[in-house]
Amino acid sequence: MLVAAAVCPCPPLLVPEVATGAAPELDPARAACTDAVGLLAAARPDRLYVVGPADEGAHGAYPAGAAGSFAGFGVDLSVRLGEGWAEGGRPLPASLTVGAWLLARAGWADAPIEGLGIDNAATPDDCAGTGRELAASAERVALLVMGDGSACRTVKAPGYLDERAAGFDAEAARALGTADVAALLALDAGLADELKAAGRAPWQVLAGAAEGAGLDGRLLFEDAPYGVGYFVAAWS
């Protein structure tokens, strides 16, 4: 059963070594992520799943100890998904690498960890089904859900300006901040793809996991630096 969840954005710029001179701009987001991860620990889960978007070839499960690197962003920094050492496995996708960094930063040692890379093209029904399976995997399950909102909020955004982006992000933020499972499942997958909202599928995994759990939500951070929607929320 799902007992807690933290929702965090997943830009590598969250890592100060990657952001370099721009690092202070995301200090509020980092602080909110730290608070959200702390609430996960307070729920005393038996198992933690880190869920995030993944490109083709990086979908599926990642064991504790799986490694990720920020070398592709010009930084000699590696992280592992919790404790342990997974030899010879696939490297973590970027979203799970950022999640592993957040957990390491918080000193996570409260429950075994597994990672799950989600296909951006997964349907809402498939995502919800995955979430239900995760929630049923242990008596007390927690999720760290990585994902960004639209990437089309300004003309300088990665996806340029799309007038629909602000409304999409507002609804996503409202749903995440109120633990509105139905609203998350109702997010349009096609529109999310057009707006480059990589969080849609992971958020719908969360929605499936939270069905019937009776969790309350709280929005800890909302902003769109660089024209990309970033949200931090805590469910408990």
What are these regions (language model features)?
Residues 29-41, 99, 124-131, 203:
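Short, hydrophobic/amphipathic alpha-helical packing segments
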Residues 33, 50, 112, 132-135, ...:
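Non-transmembrane, aqueous-exposed alpha-helical and coiled segments at domain scale
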Residues 176-222:
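Polyanion-binding loop/helix "lid" in catalytic or ligand-binding cores
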Residues 120-169:
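Active-site beta-strand/loop microenvironment that shapes enzyme catalytic pockets
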Residues 226-236:
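Short, basic/aromatic-enriched C-terminal tail that caps enzymatic domains
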Residues 159-186:
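Metal-dependent phosphoesterases centered on the DNase I-like endonuclease/exonuclease/phosphatase
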